[in-house]
Amino acid sequence: GVLKKEGDQFIVDLAGANIPLPKEKTADGALDAYVGKTLKVGIRPEDIKDDEEFLEKHSTSHLNAEVEVSELMGAEIYLYLTYQGQNLMARVAPTSKSRRGDKIVVAMDTNKIHLFDPETELTLLN
């Protein structure tokens, strides 16, 4: 994603979805040198969900994705998703109705987003 800054708010642009980063994670100024640059963005599958409560709580981090595979794994479902040509994986509740071929909205817990320098692969968020 491309890192942007509006005022004191850092935003990562994920192919058109502008995701604001939590200010407490960006307050140290370490990201200033990366504004306008493309960074690697990482998030664990358990921090991407499709349920209404999670979508409401994380209303600034929605992505419109397509379900490629829905795999029931006992107490949870793994959703293999595509978003703008990128592969994502979400670990969702077994009550999820998302199935292969569905176009769904997922949200990310922005407190759990990781940014990496694409050259050094060092993490950039505290």
Where are these regions (language model features)?
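Short, conserved beta-turn/loop elements at beta-strand boundaries and strand-helix junctions
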Residues: 5-9, 70-77, 118
